[in-house]
Amino acid sequence: MNSSIVEKTAAYFRGKGVILPTIAELKNPNLISEEIKNKVLTLDKDAMDPANLFRVHWFNQRDHSNFLDVPEHIVLPSEFTGVDAKIIVNLGRYFPLITAHKVLAAYGCLLPRILNGSFDYSKHKAVWPSTGNYCRGGVAISKILGLKSIAILPEGMSQERFNWLEKWVEDKNDIIKTKGTESNVKEIYDACNELEKNKNNDIINQFNEYYNYATHRAITGSSFEKSFLKVKGNTNLQARFYVSASGSSGTLAAGDYLKENLNTKIAVVEAIECPTLLYNGYGEHNIQGIGDKHVPLIHNVMNSDFVVGVSDEATNNLNLLFNTNEG
């Protein structure tokens, strides 16, 4: 631990009115003090205010007027899925700042660096490699803490991601566009290797950050358990599968928690157009946000039970189904 940097950062944060939420508070927002809670709930969920860090969890009410005891979720009806099993979908859209749960991973990866003094706000830049939402989360967290940051993502990602980033970064040069689309993770790594030559760049790489794994195992896992227990009620319903896309394997870590506590199996989803785990294959696809073409260091592969290939044609058709009058 670098105590002098920790003390300097603490003074800097005090001057900016920054209070960092604990992992325990994000796992259970009932632990957040009433004073902080009352302040947070008066803010716009996307405001560049450090108090919004206390919304970086699964328990935000849909209108963001309160915190919940159970995460927002939906149960897909059998008429839609064609199967009898209840399929519970936990909703990440109610996270603050970026309307996606990747902001949680970004905070979980940055927090230890702040606490141990390895990140010096006066000279370091946080570099956020991503296929889209993780770098948005990292830029958002950095911005409200007063830290410098760089976003790296493929040039072929959605325009909405780039529009958002341009509003949040200090300088448009802090958005680095690499070649390719969703599957081109190697090109992101190549850019990181170049940036890492400057020792003031701290590469916070979600694909090999064990804090990404630990954050989701602790927070997302227990949050999803509450969703299941709510749906189960007083019935004999059993949790059979936890299903998550491969991506950085952060969200997959919740499966390890659920397997340990609910005895679930873990199913890993990847695009059939880029069947890395299924066939050691590669290719291009348009399921934005799940990455591909490599197995992340933090993926607990031997604890995964099934790999599920999904075509981007299927996901594109679902977008049409739910977003057109004909659908």
Task: Go through each PLM region and give its residues.
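Acidic-glycine-rich active-site phosphate/pyrophosphate-binding loop
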Residues: 71-88, 104, 112-115, 194-198, ...
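Positively charged, low-complexity intrinsically disordered leader regions
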Residues: 2-122
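A short, small-residue-rich loop immediately preceding and capping a beta-strand
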Residues: 117-156, 235-253
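Active-site/ligand-binding loops adjacent to catalytic centers
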Residues: 186-200, 259-327
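Active-site/ligand-binding-proximal alpha/beta "capping" segment
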Residues: 195-249, 253-254, 258, 316-327
